[in-house]
């Protein structure tokens, strides 16, 4: 009879968000020693002596150690459901004194978290009441039922979700923008005459979740906070921005001026949640103009953002006497923003005293560190999502992402969203990519090591916050054990280590010791639950070994008891079994039930068998349960100690994880370059952009039956503006995007899809490719087009890359031509920005005769009788026709309409 069939009755859910209960400390007022007299002599000292006398050997890796104990489930609340909606629709409508004690406690907690959905654990369900129940039933399509609220109240609205499915439902609430407060059970057996102890164990918000199932594995989950000083007659608007990915510990701060810059930065960050206390002394904070519409704005009190409070919050969190070492006193608004953010994180993570969400020291983001990409450019270039439907497939990230780990995927996404401006840093990345492209065996060996890596960044964070499960710790050990192998492979090949890989050069010895400690303590495949035991190796702890020896003795007694009862009853088919509800029992067939001994007590009757218990068996059952409870509690204590040890090492684990992520991203880029026939661009600080046989990295992959037509480009060395003409649908927009993507790929350190390339660093990439009405803002297509053009003209410099696809087409022909001409002159003359301007205004070809730094190029077509063949080749010279009518015919416009269009064109030309 396996001892693991028994189950602890003293359990708690504390520290386990959605898992099975975890062992609890004994309740106050109750003895921590077993109640069974036979256990009085089983002191810690005697158990340790037993372990020494009967030493246990740890299982070798790969051996089975699968406990079969089942958690004891608390019965669900049994109130009958009602199909009628109760009268009480809001908790504020009731007098708490008239409520039942449980609902009174619920209302008290709800008053502390009015803006959040409060889920209250009752047995196997998380329930909510009043307005939360109504909202939950509507959003999650749950049945709205009711619960008795008291004699004077009657039934109140109630809706609930099963405990085992809570993570899935909470993830859906978070996705819809709700915040959730979880009130969990802190014990399973209340003190006599008292309510079951419950309390808020977690607050889940879109920007602070740590649970794997609520996070996108391959993108950061940013929480942001901003402090704004309004503009005055003498000073512009100034702002400080702090952003943190609570799941990875990454923290960044910056301070700038101008509302446009803030809007652009927030759009690029795409945070899950933005914290802001509003302007002035007004009550509620209205959505400011600099806040992107889709960003989730969470209002906060002003106090956490005050300078004194923010400074104290930072000092407490980082255990510092002064903030001078962080460099934040020079950025007062950023400091205040980070202080408010940190206070919000602390408020939403009710942790144990020895646990905290590990956040890195904030990194200061200086102006000019990254190539600037506004929202329009990121959308037009389809960096991480397609313009049509917002899907990953068809984007640049989809085309080049060959990373093998979640960490590497997030790293590559960050690179695409903020390409480098530092030439040395870019060249360091490119050198590694080049090494891995040419060294195929090295690349394959590294990728074999990377493939099974877990998400060390987020696993370390969960350990530090006290939320990591045993399998999380085993995954951390798996990853840390691979560090020496990665370092060995790289040291034999890399002459110069990029700064981003230095954490892998000489892994900290403490990390190897930590991995060994995890392996020494935990079995290789621990169960998901922390409450059922079966986590810790034999031979780790004398007290635990002594308890296990005692449980082995109980197993032996059960087996012997089964044999004896068979002999006494003369029934060889008798079985001694265990049921998690009824405990241990003797099972006999119906035919033999009448001949059982008189001292047997009938426990349950089934269709084909009868189940009995005996006083001796029941007494032994109590002994087993108490031993099991002590063993599970001891395992949990050992596990928590190990988890705390891992959490204390979160910073070095994450440093190594970021090195792994960088290596994964670089090896993925190398794989893309090697299989795609890409080249290593020659990078410099000039304005030159020379591309030979360049290709669009996404379109080339999507083409199946035809090959991509490559094209050249030479900008910045004599020519600053290219006027690009050609037919509709001939590939002008594709050519423009291809140029921008090659520039961007070069500045993240990647190879590029071309035969060769010389790339001077750009400070910004601007694109104006197509326009749509912004009816919500009251802007027509033409106004949107002009606003985008104005943004380019105000912010472009000689180092910018400007890609324009038609300007002025939304108004009268001569007005549009005039605007396009003036914009072209300004870009080529005053700004000298490197520009490619695709247009159907063929009159702009005349600019090349007036300005030496303007050149004409066209996309070629071939006319074969009535047919038009798009060659997709870009060559010198300006086109004289747009072939719009032919393009309309190819698009399926009815023949009579096409014929009439030709007649009108001839009349206009005459």
Swiss-Prot record:
Gene3D superfamilies registered for this protein in UniProt: 1.10.1420.10, DNA repair protein MutS, domain I, MutS, connector domain, P-loop containing nucleotide triphosphate hydrolases
Chain segments carrying region Disordered: 1-94
GO biological process, one term: mismatch repair
Record InterPro entries: DNA_mismatch_repair_MutS, DNA_mismatch_repair_MutS-lik_N, DNA_mismatch_repair_MutS/MSH, DNA_mismatch_repair_MutS_C, DNA_mismatch_repair_MutS_clamp, DNA_mismatch_repair_MutS_core, DNA_mismatch_repair_MutS_N, DNA_mismatch_repair_MutS_sf
Keyword Transcription regulation included in the entry's annotation: no
Pfam families attached to this UniProt entry: MutS_I (PF01624), MutS_II (PF05188), MutS_III (PF05192), MutS_IV (PF05190), MutS_V (PF00488)
Compositional bias per record (Low complexity), positions renumbered to this chain: 44-54
Biased composition (Polar residues): 1-15
Parts forming coiled coils: none
GO cellular component, one term: cytosol
GO molecular function: ATP binding; ATP-dependent DNA damage sensor activity; damaged DNA binding; mismatched DNA binding
Record's keyword terms, sorted: ATP-binding, DNA damage, DNA repair, DNA-binding, Nucleotide-binding
Annotated ATP binding sites: 726-733
HAMAP family to which the protein is assigned, alphabetical: MutS (MF_00096)
Function, as annotated: This protein is involved in the repair of mismatches in DNA. It is possible that it carries out the mismatch recognition step. This protein has a weak ATPase activity.
NCBIfam families in the record: mutS1, PRK05399.1
Family label: Belongs to the DNA mismatch repair MutS family.
This protein's name: DNA mismatch repair protein MutS
């Amino acid at each position: 009879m396996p001892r693991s069939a028994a189950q602890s009755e003293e359990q708690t859910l504390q520290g386990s968000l959605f898992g099975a209960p975890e062992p609890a400390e004994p309740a106050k007022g109750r003895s921590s020693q077993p109640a069974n007299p036979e256990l009085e002599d089983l002191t810690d000292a005697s158990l340790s002596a037993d372990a020494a006398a009967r030493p246990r050997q740890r299982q070798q890796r790969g051996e089975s150690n699968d406990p079969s104990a089942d958690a004891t489930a608390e019965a669900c609340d049994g109130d009958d459901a009602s199909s009628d909606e109760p009268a009480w629709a809001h908790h504020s409508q009731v007098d708490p004194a008239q409520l039942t004690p449980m609902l009174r406690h619920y209302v008290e907690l709800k008053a502390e978290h009015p803006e959040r959905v409060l889920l209250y654990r009752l047995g196997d369900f998380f329930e909510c009441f009043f307005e939360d129940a109504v909202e939950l039933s509507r959003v999650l399509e749950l049945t709205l039922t009711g619960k008795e609220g008291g004699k004077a109240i009657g039934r109140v609205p109630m809706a609930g979700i099963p405990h085992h499915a809570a993570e899935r439902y909470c993830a859906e609430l978070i996705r819809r923008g709700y915040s959730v407060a979880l009130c969990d059970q802190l014990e399973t057996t209340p003190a006599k005459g008292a309510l079951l102890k419950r309390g808020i164990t977690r607050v889940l918000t879109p920007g602070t979740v740590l649970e794997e199932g609520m996070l996108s594995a391959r993108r950061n989950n940013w929480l942001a906070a901003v402090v704004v000083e309004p503009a005055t007659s003498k000073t512009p608007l100034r702002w400080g921005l702090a952003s943190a990915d609570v799941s990875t510990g990454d923290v960044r701060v910056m301070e700038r001026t101008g509302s446009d810059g803030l809007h652009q930065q927030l759009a690029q960050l795409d945070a899950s949640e933005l914290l802001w206390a509003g302007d002035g002394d007004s009550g509620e904070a209205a959505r400011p103009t600099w806040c992107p519409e889709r960003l989730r704005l969470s209002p906060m009190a002003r106090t956490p953002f005050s300078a004194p409070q923010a400074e104290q919050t930072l000092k407490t969190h980082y255990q510092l006497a002064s903030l001078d070492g962080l460099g934040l006193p020079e950025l007062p608004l950023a400091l205040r923003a980070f202080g408010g953010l940190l206070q919000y994180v602390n408020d939403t993570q009710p942790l144990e005293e020895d646990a905290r969400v590990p956040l890195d020291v904030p990194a200061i983001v200086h102006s000019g560190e990254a190539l600037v990409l506004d929202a329009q450019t990121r959308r037009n270039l389809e960096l991480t999502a397609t313009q049509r439907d917002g899907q990953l497939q068809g984007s640049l990230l989809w085309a080049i992402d060959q990373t093998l780990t979640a960490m590497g995927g997030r790293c590559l996404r960050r690179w695409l969203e903020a390409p480098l401006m530092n030439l040395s840093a870019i060249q360091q990345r490119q050198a590694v990519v080049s090494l891995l492209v040419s060294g195929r065996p090295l690349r394959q060996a590294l990728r074999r090591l990377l493939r099974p890596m877990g998400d060390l960044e987020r696993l370390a964070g969960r350990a530090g916050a006290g939320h990591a499960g045993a399998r999380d710790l085993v995954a951390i050990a798996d990853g840390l054990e691979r560090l020496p192998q990665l370092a060995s492979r790289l040291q034999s090949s890399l002459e110069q280590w990029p700064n981003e890989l230095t954490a892998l050069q000489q892994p900290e010895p403490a990390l190897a010791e930590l991995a060994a400690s995890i392996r020494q303590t935990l079995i290789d495949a621990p169960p998901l639950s922390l409450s059922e035991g079966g986590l810790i190796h034999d031979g780790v702890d004398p007290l635990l070994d002594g308890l296990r020896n005692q449980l082995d003795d109980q197993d032996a007694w059960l087996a012997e008891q089964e044999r004896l009862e068979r002999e006494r009853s003369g029934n060889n088919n008798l079985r001694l079994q265990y049921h998690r509800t009824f405990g241990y029992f003797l099972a006999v067939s119906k035919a033999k039930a009448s001949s059982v001994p008189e001292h047997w007590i009938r426990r349950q009757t089934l269709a084909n068998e009868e189940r009995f218990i005996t006083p001796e068996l029941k007494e032994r059952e109590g002994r087993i349960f108490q031993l099991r409870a002590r063993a599970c509690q001891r395992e949990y204590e050992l596990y928590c100690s190990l988890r705390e040890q891992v959490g204390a090492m979160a910073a070095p684990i994450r440093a190594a994880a970021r090195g792994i992520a960088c290596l994964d991203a670089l090896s993925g880029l190398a794989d893309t370059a090697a299989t795609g026939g890409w080249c290593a661009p020659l990078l410099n600080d000039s304005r030159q952009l020379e591309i030979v046989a360049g290709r669009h990295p996404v379109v080339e992959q999507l083409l199946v039956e035809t090959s991509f037509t490559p094209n050249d480009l030479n900008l910045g060395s004599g020519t600053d503006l290219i006027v690009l003409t050609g037919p509709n649908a001939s590939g002008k927009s594709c050519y423009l995007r291809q140029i921008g993507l090659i520039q961007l790929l070069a500045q993240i350190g990647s190879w590029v899809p071309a035969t060769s390339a010389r790339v001077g660093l750009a400070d910004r990439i601007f694109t104006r490719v197509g326009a749509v009405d912004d009816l919500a803002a009251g802007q027509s297509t033409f106004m949107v087009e002009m606003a985008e053009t104005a943004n380019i003209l105000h912010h472009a410099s000689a180092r910018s890359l400007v890609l324009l696809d038609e300007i002025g087409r939304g108004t009268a022909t001569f007005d549009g031509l005039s605007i396009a001409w003036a914009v072209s002159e300004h870009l080529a003359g005053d700004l000298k920005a490197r520009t490619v301007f695709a247009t159907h205004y063929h009159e702009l070809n005349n600019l090349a005769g007036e300005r030496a730094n303007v050149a004409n190029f066209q996309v070629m077509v071939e006319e074969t009788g009535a047919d038009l063949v798009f060659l997709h080749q870009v060559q010198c010279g300006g086109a004289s026709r747009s072939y719009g009518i032919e393009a309309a015919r190819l698009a399926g416009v009815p023949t009579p309409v096409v014929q009439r269009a030709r007649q009108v064109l001839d009349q206009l030309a005459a």
